[in-house]
Amino acid sequence: MSASRFIKCVTVGDGAVGKTCMLISYTSNTFPTDYVPTVFDNFSANVVVDGNTVNLGLWDTAGQEDYNRLRPLSYRGADVFLLAFSLISKASYENVSKKWIPELKHYAPGVPIILVGTKLDLRDDKQFFVDHPGAVPITTAQGEELRKQIGAPYYIECSSKTQLNVKGVFDAAIKVVLQPPKAKKKKKAQRGACSIL
């Protein structure tokens, strides 16, 4: 077996969309029931991918505006971002392109982004929408459209509570780092070359 490769994976997105729960669900197979806003936290997990051991460094960030100046400090050296929004929060969905993409392009240009829709278990929960009349569910088609708009290689919906697709989120993050998608070659206009010295 080869030496382990370190991959730094940073979660970003609005506060309370479920970033920390997704990390805890992935690393410990449990679901925390209390909401405690994250300041910054790190997790580490050894994962075997195609016979290679990967040390996946998971960096959790705070989405609240109070941390706008501090949060980008965790972006340095990132190999991949998990950009999360809640499937039951239109505001968090809209902030992907309004807030998070501009921030990531400014502080970490060129780093791949996996778009993640969280709280999948609540999207089809009729009682949730009765109890929260202002909540608007985000469809899979809307998520795919946003993925195309921001140029993310993957869009994955998951539920940390039921663990549905949680592993898939992190598998995609590892895959995009180990096997980056081929960049489309830009066609250069064929013209006669002329140099003036």
From Swiss-Prot:
This protein's record includes keyword Hydrolase: no
Chain positions with Cysteine methyl ester modification: 194
A Gene Ontology cellular-component term: cell projection
Motif position, Effector region: 35-43
InterPro entries per the UniProt record, alphabetical: P-loop_NTPase, Small_GTP-bd, Small_GTPase, Small_GTPase_Rho
Keyword Zinc attached: no
Keywords tagged on the record: Cytoplasm, GTP-binding, Lipoprotein, Membrane, Methylation, Nucleotide-binding, Prenylation
Single GO molecular function: GTPase activity
Function description: Inactive GDP-bound Rho GTPases reside in the cytosol, are found in a complex with Rho GDP-dissociation inhibitors (Rho GDIs), and are released from the GDI protein in order to translocate to membranes upon activation.
Name by which UniProt lists this protein: Rac-like GTP-binding protein 6
Gene name of the record: RAC6
